[in-house]
């Protein structure tokens, strides 16, 4: 059952995320008739606009970032009329009355989206409270990063929960809005084919890769203070681990799903001072070639020395009955050869081959779930090659390919934020992250960082356009595992 609000407040509405993702997502929902006709979207930032001026600004953002086949003049005009604007200094609580004047009755519900730096959260919450916009009918969405470690994350969450209850807080991880990520739950729990094998008896190992070809790309200040472990592993990749490893929830209600995810985070085997050398690899890209062009190294781009990692590979374990003994190899990095996010589940080989050795080597079955750039699900199978085979069957590994883009080519491809924005407006918290999840994630991440510090581990330089340091290959190879590149 939905609980739709009548007003949305969008902080940071002139920022890059708003222009590229948030405003286009809201437009897409409205163009498809998924937003109420009387929904008011109150936008705010420090930029000096009136409502008409901001509507002009928003129109330019839509023209630039919405796919041309989704743009429609009538739909655009209808959406722009939903937008209202007030210039507000988020650090001055007395200015929030301007937002209250634009919002109308709060009892009809308000969805508040803080697309701002975490350092501004407390000021925003104080202003919302003072203006009467933080009552029981409000819900609050927070963009990452939610802290730099457990202590700072707790500080943010404590400040938020002094005013809002946990059920009012919607912590965003945009990976959870991706269609293929959501499809992982359907794949696992909607098909009898996989569940009997989805455990340590049937699965040899799991690989999760999130690879980027870009370097800093304008994120110098944030990224150098964060690094790949905190930027990507703590949030996106650990959420993917949870969706692969979680037990079936009783139903698809928000807390039922999140209860099972947090059990996975708490079951992650700690990586400490004694195991960081054997279970983690860190790297930092040097100069090289990316996209056919010569590119500078990280330190040259940054303009100063830095020990921040731009690549990390980890051998992780989930210590419970289902997954005992199954390694999860995870890696992420910048300036890698391809932009790709994927999960590869490798099943155990057949216990005995009945086929002639001259027919080829049996390969273990694999399930490959590609999240980006294309949304694809593939399964590898061994088949017999056509022929008379007088000396025994000749076998080959082939991939059964389910391209969601092709299968559902008559459906619009939505960006992840469309789903998340709609769920926020309608009050469905399933794809948002609960506080205990965040805390359990940070406990594991902090242990790794403490191990790096205690052992004075520094990132190893790798050439841009390669798959990270050679030690990352060795991390898997010494277990007889090859990264799926």
Curated annotation (Swiss-Prot):
It catalyses: D-glucose 6-phosphate + NADP(+) = 6-phospho-D-glucono-1,5-lactone + NADPH + H(+). GO terms for cellular component: cytosol. The active site is at 236 (proton acceptor). Pathway: Carbohydrate degradation; pentose phosphate pathway; D-ribulose 5-phosphate from D-glucose 6-phosphate (oxidative stage): step 1/3. Keywords: Carbohydrate metabolism, Glucose metabolism, NADP, Oxidoreductase. InterPro entries: G6P_DH, G6P_DH_AS, G6P_DH_C, G6P_DH_NAD-bd, NAD(P)-bd_dom_sf. GO terms for biological process: glucose metabolic process; pentose-phosphate shunt, oxidative branch. Catalyzes the oxidation of glucose 6-phosphate to 6-phosphogluconolactone. This is Glucose-6-phosphate 1-dehydrogenase.
């Amino acid at each position: 059952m939905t609980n739709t609000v009548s007003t949305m407040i969008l902080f940071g509405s002139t920022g890059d995320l708003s222009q590229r993702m948030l405003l286009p997502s809201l437009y897409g929902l409205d163009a498809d008739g998924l937003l109420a006709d009387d929904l008011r979207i109150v936008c705010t930032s420090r930029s000096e606009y009136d409502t008409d001026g901001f509507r002009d600004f928003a129109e330019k953002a839509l023209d630039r970032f919405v796919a041309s086949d989704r743009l429609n003049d009538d739909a655009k005009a209808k959406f722009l009329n939903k937008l209202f604007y007030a210039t507000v200094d988020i650090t001055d609580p007395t200015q929030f009355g301007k937002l209250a004047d634009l919002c109308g009755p709060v009892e009809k519900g308000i969805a508040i989206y803080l697309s701002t730096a975490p350092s501004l959260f407390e000021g925003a919450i104080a202003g919302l409270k003072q203006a009467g916009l933080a009552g029981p009918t409000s819900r609050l969405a927070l963009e990452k990063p939610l802290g730099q470690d457990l202590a700072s994350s707790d500080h943010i969450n404590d400040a938020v929960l002094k005013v809002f209850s946990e059920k009012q807080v919607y912590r965003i991880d945009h990976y959870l809005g991706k269609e293929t990520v959501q499809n992982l739950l359907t794949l696992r729990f909607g098909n009898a084919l996989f569940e009997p094998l989805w455990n340590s008896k049937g699965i040899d190992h799991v690989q999760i890769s999130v690879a980027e070809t870009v370097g800093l790309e304008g994120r110098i200040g944030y990224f150098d203070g964060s690094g790949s472990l905190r930027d990507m592993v703590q949030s996106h990749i650990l959420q993917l681990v949870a969706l692969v490893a979680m037990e079936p929830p009783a139903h698809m209600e928000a807390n039922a799903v999140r209860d099972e995810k947090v059990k996975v985070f708490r079951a992650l085997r700690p990586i400490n001072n004694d195991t960081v050398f054997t279970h983690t690899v860190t790297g930092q890209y040097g100069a090289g070639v990316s996209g056919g062009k010569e590119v500078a190294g990280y330190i040259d781009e940054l303009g100063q020395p830095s020990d921040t990692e731009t690549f990390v590979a980890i051998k992780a374990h989930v210590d419970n009955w289902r997954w005992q003994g199954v390694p999860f190899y995870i890696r992420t990095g910048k300036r890698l050869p391809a932009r790709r996010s994927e999960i590869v589940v490798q099943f155990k080989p057949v216990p005995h081959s009945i086929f002639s050795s001259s027919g080829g080597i049996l390969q273990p079955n694999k399930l490959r779930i590609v999240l980006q750039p294309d949304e694809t699900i593939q399964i590898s199978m061994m088949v017999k090659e056509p022929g008379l085979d007088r000396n025994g069957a000749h076998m080959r590994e082939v991939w059964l390919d389910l391209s969601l883009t092709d299968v559902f080519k008559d459906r619009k491809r939505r960006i992840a934020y469309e789903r998340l924005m709609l769920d926020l407006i309608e009050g469905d918290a399933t794809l948002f992250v609960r506080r205990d999840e965040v805390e359990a994630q940070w406990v594991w991440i902090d242990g790794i960082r403490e191990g790096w510090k205690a052992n004075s581990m520094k990132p190893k330089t790798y050439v841009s356009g390669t798959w990270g340091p050679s030690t990352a290959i060795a991390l898997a190879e010494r277990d007889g595992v090859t990264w799926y590149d």
